Regions:
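A short, Trp-centered hydrophobic/proline-enriched beta-strand micro-motif
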Residues: 51-57, 164
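Edge beta-strand at a domain terminus
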Residues: 28, 161-182
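Exposed beta-sheet edge/beta-hairpin loop segments within beta-rich domains
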Residues: 142, 151-155
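N-terminal helix-cap/turn-to-beta initiation motif at the start of protein domains
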Residues: 38-53
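Central antiparallel beta-sheet cores of small beta-barrel/beta-sandwich binding domains
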Residues: 32, 37-40, 56-144
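Boundary at the C-terminal end of the N-terminal hydrophobic targeting segment
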Residues: 19-22, 27
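Gram-negative bacterial Sec-dependent N-terminal signal peptides
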Residues: 3-19
Length: 182
């Protein structure tokens, strides 16, 4: 009896937790109220292709250091937001992706203590680039350290591989970083 009870409890918890994750074809309701899915830009769709966990190594141009990295993208908020949990050399950060008025807005919560906001500069089937949205970021190049741009390029020969590149402004100097991910 204990085994059956444990199994049923686990099934209920697992089923309830899976029910909270939205897919493209499911309507999301909270308390019987339908939630609108407002994330439909081409850039949001490009980020959705990355859902899951990607791991690899990053090379930092400033020091030449090579270190382990992981990036995990999850769909949340009824399918309207994607969160990216980043771990670079053991340091965790967070980036959010959501559409506002049909445009992808990216906000990065950085280990540098800054929160740059980005807009899409290019999106295609093979890559997506974002750059600092200076109108929405209260950051000054003379006074702050922050990520200035990011780019993801999918490997055409291997759908389970991509390259991630970013540029970071550190004490007025730009450093470029590159990670190969699987």
């Amino acid at each position: 009896m204990k085994t059956i009870t444990t199994f049923l409890a686990a099934a209920l918890v697992f089923g309830a937790s899976n029910a909270a994750v939205a897919s493209d074809s499911e309507a999301v309701t909270v308390g019987g109220v339908a939630m609108e899915n407002s994330s439909s830009s081409a850039a949001f769709a490009a980020v959705k292709k990355k859902l899951g966990k990607w791991e690899g190594q990053m090379t930092q141009s400033l020091t030449g250091a090579v270190f382990d990295v992981s990036y995990e993208w999850r769909l949340t908020s009824g399918g309207n937001t994607i969160t990216e949990t980043i771990v670079e050399d053991g340091v965790e950060m967070l980036t959010t992706y959501n559409d506002r008025d049909g445009e992808l807005v990216v906000k990065h919560y950085c280990a540098l203590g800054t929160e740059p906001v980005f807009k899409v500069s290019e999106v295609s089937d093979a890559s997506m680039s974002i750059a600092l949205d200076e109108a929405k970021s209260d950051l000054q190049r003379a006074h702050h350290n922050f990520v200035t741009d990011m780019k993801w390029t999918m490997d055409a020969s291997d759908p389970n591989a991509m390259v991630f590149e970013n540029s970071v402004l550190l004490d007025g100097e730009v450093t470029n970083n590159r990670a190969e991910l699987k």
